[in-house]
Amino acid sequence: SFSDTIKQCDRIQVDGKVREMTDDDRLRAKKANAEYASRGLRSMALAYRVIDRDVDINKMPIDEAESHLIFVGLTTMSDPPRPEIYDAVKRCHQAKIRIIMVTGDSKLTAKSVAVQIGLTSGKARVISGNELEKMSDDELRKALKGEVIFARVAPEQKYRIVKNCQANGEVVASTGDGVNDAPALKQADIGIAMGQTGTDVAKEAANMILTDDNFASIVAAIEEGRAVYSNIRKFLTYILTSNVPEAIPSVLFLFSAGLIPLPMTVMQILTVDLGTDMLPALGLGAEAADPDIMNQPPRKRSEHLLNKGVMIKAFCWYGLLSSLISSGAYFFVNWQNGWPAKGLAASGSVYMRATTMVLGAIVFTQIANVLNCRTNKTSIFKKGLFSNKNIWYGIVFEICL
């Protein structure tokens, strides 16, 4: 690094001539380095030492060989962020996903790049590897709760950062490519190794390999994961709903001591469960993600797939409404055919028409149900009524069956 190199220099080369290096020379070099770093450039100090030919450099101690150097100047390199990183960082902020930069660059360079890509507004605390070494775990956990950037950090220190993030209750995904990154990748909830530049050790320790080494691909994977999780919940809501109109008539049959015959035969129940419901339910699995899925905060670690919201929607809302419609259809057919309110026929043409009406009512309420399940918040017309053709293939099959 610049700071390590400049400490070993006691002379400077100016216009081809070598002279003693003054404090003013050091100050100018430091100012130039800071200026480059503030612009997001990576600077490297160039220095050399003249050694006599009769000296075997391979036998010289490293400390001696790298001392009394002649400072030549600075060279800079530009490593601009990929164009897609700006949108990826923005989407992470919208999804309430925190990004903590851990880099080997200088503090100024790290902060400049972070501001440039929109990672921070410029108020983030920048902690160097040396400062991190002196911090206690309590101090580190406190720092990790706010905006923070880690600069000049050794790969081995990433493990400590990951572990203390987890101590704060965070679900941590860590990226890395080197052998020394393996402990952090192993400790993280999701270890992500670089596919192109990553070592075999890092890939072995990771849970996931990023084939294109692109941060934007991680964000895309998060969106896809959220979409799959959401679709599973939609699938469960749809499947569980039909159990209510199937179960309530059976309960009425039991409590009426047989005065109200079963509104659905066993064959009709199997037709709904194994026939008409299956294809539309599978179509929900191919549903595109909701437009606002990346505007929602991450779910809690303790939250179950089959949560209270799914149960209420399936059993107390969609299911109850479907039960009222199907039961109403059953009693309506009997009433039309002179039901005297003293008992219902358990066989005959009236009973067959009534059970057929119940089956038809459940099928058509399930059609409405599958369309409702496609989106949680936005209107189905806004998302596109016919955008998921698989569901409509299932609906046509359901009606034909």
Which residues does each predicted region cover?
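Cytosolic catalytic headpieces and adjacent flexible linkers of membrane translocases
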Residues: 1-164, 168, 182, 196-197, ...
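Membrane-embedded transport module
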Residues: 121-174, 188, 193-378
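Conserved catalytic-loop aspartate of Hanks-type protein kinases
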Residues: 177
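Basic, alpha-helical nucleic-acid-binding regions used in initiation and control of genome expression
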Residues: 185
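Hydrophobic, membrane-inserted alpha-helices
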Residues: 248-249, 398-401
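C-terminal membrane-solvent junction of multi-pass transporters and transport-like membrane proteins
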Residues: 306, 311, 377-399
